[in-house]
Regions:
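Short helix-coil transition sites and intra-membrane helix breaks within transmembrane domains
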Residues: 19-23, 59-62, 73-83, 109-122, ...
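Core transmembrane alpha-helical segments of multi-pass membrane transporters/permeases
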Residues: 25-28, 48-83, 108, 275-340
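Hydrophobic core segments of alpha-helical transmembrane domains in multi-pass membrane transport
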Residues: 5-17, 28-37, 66-71, 105-110, ...
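Interfacial loop-to-transmembrane junctions
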Residues: 89, 93, 424-445
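Re-entrant/interfacial helical elements at transmembrane boundaries that shape
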Residues: 70, 84-86, 117-130, 159-171, ...
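Alpha-helical transmembrane segments of multi-pass membrane proteins
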Residues: 96-109, 136-153, 179-188, 354-368, ...
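Hydrophobic alpha-helical transmembrane segments of multi-pass integral membrane proteins
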Residues: 63-69, 92-129, 322-330, 351-389
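Long, contiguous bundles of hydrophobic transmembrane helices that form the permeation core
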Residues: 6, 38, 181-310, 427-428, ...
């Protein structure tokens, strides 16, 4: 019964998200409904002590990233930089390659360490402009961005600095470059299968006479009265964000050390911060600030008259995206604390093959919690020792465990209630009903990829 309660809460939230209801409202309703059916006396403590703690903790850490990312994306749009880059890309590659260009831009940014949430805000203006000029249905933008930002550069490509590739290293004593050949094989599979799927969907739409669409929501502004800047100037803030993010990731620990104690005259006690936990967040915030300043410096004349309204729009978008994701994060924390979740975790331990066991466990928990990093953290915290023991018994290198766990986390995490999916749809002005089925197909490709990697390892022994 406890398992049914947990799954029912998940089903309710997924249904609410798919039908367009606010996740900010339904995440606590679904989570606390499950608590009510489990232990009515625990509803209030679970809401305050688990749901709100996790939700507020997420906002505390990540809202500045959402805000700066939204402002950066809006300025890229208002300055005409997005149109300039799109025009150059179309001249270079032609309109037939619009989806490939967007996938590669997303991949470049995420592999450079830019948060996938930031990529959504920053790339959407480019994608909308390119899809409009190429007359590709707007509903395919989310799946295209998802392929570039939420898949192979998130957890498969060796060396990626995304958190999904870092978490396994703390459990298996590996590095971000673990099992490089398996990672490359997984990357090639996801990229090729994903592009084939997107191209197939585009061809089907073209045959049906479906174009970009009309009367759409949240469309980037397309001012016709501005002179388009040089595409290299337009591209420079985007490149600068990736480069500075990488540099700040190395500089911040050198400046502050492992911990930093802040003691200002008005403080009753010093505040000690563990720098390692905040390095990635501080780095991307600093990089985005520099990117914003670059856009303002190069495009202020075009932006000036629209800056007030544009900044309001960006702040509104950031608030909605952050609250959606934080509410989902709180939901996952509550569900993970229920008896049904523990029963499910224990059942998963019974799967005999260590790599298949790990892959199924991580991807299922990522799906239930709606978070790749959250599901993987829960799975590895509870079961990493058993995975390691089984791997040693089967002579499987721990590097393979790392790569399988990372890739599995990015499989079923993108179900309808996933925070990144909700953010992506909110930013693009689309609904689950309009665009989610294409995202789900990318999810299936990504889920299948980890089993392709496992089969490759057993067939060849390559690592």
């Amino acid at each position: 019964m406890s398992v049914i309660i947990a799954l029912a809460a998940l089903a309710l939230l997924m249904l609410a998200a798919y039908r367009g209801y606010s996740v900010i409202l339904f995440a606590p309703i679904a989570a606390l409904g499950a608590v009510l059916l489990t232990d009515p006396s625990a509803v209030a403590p679970a809401f305050t002590g688990v749901f709100m703690e996790k939700m507020v903790g997420f906002i505390k850490l990540y809202f500045p990233v959402f805000l700066l990312g939204a402002v950066f994306g809006k300025l890229i749009e208002l300055s005409g930089f997005s149109r300039s880059i799109v025009a150059a890309a179309i001249r270079l590659l032609g309109t037939r390659q619009a989806m490939l260009v967007i996938v590669l831009v997303c991949a470049l940014l995420t592999y450079g360490g830019v948060s996938l949430f930031v990529v959504v805000f920053a790339v959407y203006p480019f994608a909308a402009e390119m899809f409009r000029q190429s007359n590709i249905p707007k509903r395919l933008i989310p799946a295209t961005i998802a392929l570039g930002a939420f898949s192979f550069t998130m957890d498969a490509l060796p060396g990626t600095p995304q958190i999904q590739n870092i978490i396994p290293s703390t459990f298996f004593n590996t590095t971000a470059w673990a099992a490089p050949w398996l990672g490359v094989i997984g990357t090639i599979f996801v990229f090729c299968a994903g592009m084939l799927f997107l191209q197939r969907q585009r061809n089907k739409a073209q045959k049906a006479g479906e174009g970009y669409g009309t009367e759409l929501r949240n469309e980037p502004e397309t001012a016709e009265d501005i002179q388009l800047p040089n595409p290299w100037i337009a591209l420079s803030p985007l490149l600068m964000v990736g480069i500075m993010n990488l540099l700040f990731t190395h500089w911040i620990p050198l400046w502050y050390g492992k911990t930093h104690s802040l003691a200002l005259p008005g403080m009753t006690a010093p505040v000690t911060t563990e720098i390692a936990k905040l390095t990635a967040i501080w780095a991307v915030q600093a990089a985005l600030l520099i990117g914003i300043l670059m856009v303002l410096a190069f495009g202020f004349s075009a932006i000036r008259s629209k800056l007030a309204e544009g900044s309001k729009s960006a702040v509104s978008g950031a608030l909605l995206a952050a609250m959606n994701t934080a509410s989902e994060y709180g939901f996952g924390a509550v569900i993970a604390s229920l008896p049904g979740f523990l029963v499910l975790a224990d059942w998963l331990k019974s799967i005999p093959n260590p790599l298949v066991n790990e892959a199924i466990t991580v991807t299922l928990l990522a799906g239930i919690t709606g978070s790749a990093s959250g599901g993987m953290s829960i799975a590895l915290a509870a079961m990493s020792e058993s995975f390691i023991s089984a791997a040693h018994a089967a002579n499987i290198p721990l590097e393979v465990l790392h790569r399988v766990a990372a890739m599995a986390s990015g499989g079923m995490d993108t179900l309808p209630h996933n925070g990144a999916v909700i953010t992506l749809l909110a930013v693009t002005g689309l609904t689950h009903r309009e665009a989610y089925k294409d995202i789900f197909c990318i999810t299936l490709i990504k889920t299948l990829a980890v089993f392709v990697v496992i089969a490759t390892f057993y067939a060849t022994g390559i690592v």
